[in-house]
C-alpha cells in the first residue's frame, strides 16, 4: 500500500478529492474521536465496524485501485499495516484530534 506522502503532483489532488469525504465522515464520529487520544486500538475497532465502506474507499483511492480490487486484496494480516500507514500520516492524525 502506498503512503499518502508518496502520492505527488496532480495525482495528489485527485486522491485528496476522493478520500476527503470518507475521512471527514469517520473523523466527525464522536465515538471515534473520543477514543483516538486514549485508545487508538479501540478507535480503529469502532471505525472498522461502523465505516467499512469508507475505509475501503480510502485504501482504494490511495492505491489507485477500485474498491472491489481493494476488498479482494485486503486480508487479516495486511489490514493492520494499512491502518497503521494511514494513521501515521500527521495530516490524518490532526483530523481526529
Model-derived features with residue positions:
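Charged interaction scaffolds used for protein-protein
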Residues: 1-48, 53, 60-97
